[in-house]
Amino acid sequence: MRWRYTIRDQSPFEESSNCHRLTSSETANTFRWPMRTYNVYGFLLTCTCLLLILTIIPMSGGSSERVQRSVRSVVETKNNIKYGVICDAGSSGTRLFVYTLKPLSGGLTNIDTLIHESEPVVKKVTPGLSSFGDKPEQVVEYLTPLLRFAEEHIPYEQLGETDLLIFATAGMRLLPEAQKDAIIKNLQNGLKSVTALRVSDSNIRIIDGAWEGIYSWIAVNYILGRFDKENDSKVGMIDMGGASVQIAFEIANEKESYNGGNVYEINLGSIETNEDYKYKIYSTTFLGYGANEGLKKYENSLVKSGNSNDSCSPRGLNRLIGEFTVNGTGEWDVCLAQVSSLIGDKAQPSCPNPTCFLRNVIAPSVNLSTVQLYGFSEYWYTTSNFGSGGEYHYQKFTDEVRKYCQKDWNDIQDGFKRNEFPNADIERLGTNCFKAAWVTSVLHDGFNVDKTKHLFQSVLKIAGEEMQWALGAMLYHSKDLKFNLLEQLEVAQSTQQISNFFSFFVILIIVLAVALYRQLQSESTYKKYNFLRTDSKPDFLNV
């Protein structure tokens, strides 16, 4: 085979005959590549945006819910039961209670008294914490037996996770400030070295009467199941001790314009913004209106008036008030009128509000006759002594009291010897008439509860459980534990978000890598294509 060469001269400016001239269709194809590239980039950008949206939506919705369900499944297992220890440091002694706590995310804590061998884990030591006012260095040793008792009933591995609460009440309130501070400081500084329980300074303190009332209100309604979402009805409570009387009830009417104080907004839910467990409570303590302080008021009135006839004592009971001798007459109706006159402070101006407690104290415009009220302590002891404990009937109760007060004191003493009064000692029998008049007057004249149309009852136990404000305190403060659980939930959600963002960026990098690879591949193809079109034959042939 022979090669045929064609050689001719040509100007440098003359187009070579072997140079390929682009046709119009080829020109269009040459400039179509950038447009295709833009389309590819647009497509990739759209895909990226869709990926971003599909990544963010689960973070704010379904994924978050899945995380919450996952955490709840851990939180609400039987193996996640926590423990709580609380000491009720009263005036006569300190009682320790151990509770089991099962947190439920978003709602109330399921709380129960710890039971061991069919008995509640409860222990009391005497005397009261306030008796250490002049020897505060001994308070740690005083409480140590209680703490050892609690530690014996809590799994060892959970001792460090179990909070210890020590709340002191009336006895400690009466001490001088220096003695109060010394006792509290010794407990805060000394307990951490003698117990494995978790001790926090903020959980060792003196609580005021209003909060004692709130804790009682919480305990009563919790035991009765009144915090269930479908149950809107809450009960109120009146707790009369020896020195004071406490009252607490819900102000459910949002239109209530009362601004006289003693109103507290509490939230028992694990999230402050959760309105399901948020309540507005009126709670206060009236010092001087306990049964023993009331007796002092009555006795002082007899001495001041020079009246030696004691209508509030059984007939024939003669006694000394200081150096003044009074003689029991057992006149119940006279007694009731005299005691009623002691309610309120006559030195204070009359109450300008339509509703007032104890005749002088401005109160919310809530008709307590329509509120289901539970009476504790002295209300139970006094009414039950006359066979009227439980559902309260004014006429039946006063009839029984009247019969008792008219008895001769010698006959009452003989009945005591025959065990006719199993729930009272001899001193109590002498004051029964007065205390019946006092609790009645405070209820009807002090708190305006109607004598016939009302929902009041005296109780010692609710659903077989003795009411203790300590239960309410533990329930209220258990939300601190729930906040810790929420932190776990937030960490899980944060971890999920980080995972989602990481996944998004991985996808984005892959998309960009594919785009870059396609661009490089397209450029290479384009250059090769142009080369082939402009150089149809090897250079050495163009000679």
UniProtKB/Swiss-Prot annotation:
It is found in: Golgi apparatus membrane. GO terms for biological process: ATP metabolic process; CTP metabolic process; GDP metabolic process; GTP metabolic process; UDP catabolic process; UDP metabolic process. Pfam families: GDA1_CD39. Its EC number is 3.6.1.15. The keyword Ribonucleoprotein does not apply. InterPro entries: GDA1_CD39_NTPase. GO terms for cellular component: Golgi apparatus; Golgi membrane; membrane; perinuclear region of cytoplasm. The lineage of its organism: Eukaryota, Metazoa, Ecdysozoa, Nematoda, Chromadorea. It is a multi-pass membrane protein. Keywords: Golgi apparatus, Hydrolase, Membrane, Transmembrane, Transmembrane helix. It comes from Caenorhabditis elegans. In contrast to uda-1, expression is not induced by stress. Seems to be able to hydrolyze CTP, ATP and UTP. GO terms for molecular function: ATP hydrolysis activity; CTPase activity; GDP phosphatase activity; GTPase activity; ribonucleoside triphosphate phosphatase activity; UDP phosphatase activity. PROSITE patterns: GDA1_CD39_NTPASE. It catalyses: a ribonucleoside 5'-triphosphate + H2O = a ribonucleoside 5'-diphosphate + phosphate + H(+). This is Nucleoside-triphosphatase ntp-1. The keyword Membrane applies. Belongs to the GDA1/CD39 NTPase family.
